[in-house]
Amino acid sequence: MFLDYNPTQGKVAGDHAYKTQQPLPPLNRWVQSYWQLTVPKGLFHYHSVPDNCVDWIINLDCFDDNFFIPPFLSSTVFHIDGPASFFGIRFRILGHQGLISVPLGEWGEVGSVKAEDLLPADIVYSVYEVIYNAKSFDKRCNSLSAVILSAVTFADVDPRLARYIRYCYENVSSNLDLSDSQSSKFGLSARQLRRLTKQHVGLLPKDFGKVLRFQSVLRAMSALQSNKVYLDHYYDQSHFVREFKRLSGVTPTQFKKMSVLYNHYSSK
């Protein structure tokens, strides 16, 4: 399934510290974006927020340090000893299934898993060759697109799960109804829905919906000058601030001002 869903991770201070590129069709059905983070010398923190996506993160200075990160529900802070550079492949919702046959529910609880434990050795080696030989971000993106496109397959997505995900996406501004009555419209019970989403999305149904709404607000905050973007998504401002802080670890005002990459000894 394809959703035009483009999450954000917040801004990084510095002109060239963080780069992103979206792949062209047809690969964009599976991969949402490529990204590259360049960290200067020093002890740094990278403040990552939930986005419902699976990321493949590769240390450009040490390919053995490459791993998959599953979706998560609260902010995750990565501690980085710079200088260092990381390249990432952010998959669309369920897009990782085009490469990974192991259900997310069987490895997502670990927190991170080495790519070699989830992918065939030839795919990992082909990606290694690209990372080793391509010396620029654009070349890496273009070469990796060819590698991934040759390896990716159309995974069988349970139509009931697809209906649920599309329902969440199309009703992101409303209070999601995940009762047995609503779940029956997807073709299953609320209990079956919980089991299905946990197995394939990595989160419980309500949590998945909360992250979609959170990401919708983040994009609105980036695009608008108004401080009342919450009006389209939450009951009131206190509800908005409370849930925003629960997911991001900071208040909306703090997030708008901060660089998500910051020095260990400095404030955000």
Label each residue range with its predicted role.
Residues V157-P159, C168, T197-M221, E243-V260:
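Alpha-helical DNA-contacting segments of helix-turn-helix folds
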Residues D180-S181, L196:
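Conserved binding-pocket/active-site segment within a compact domain
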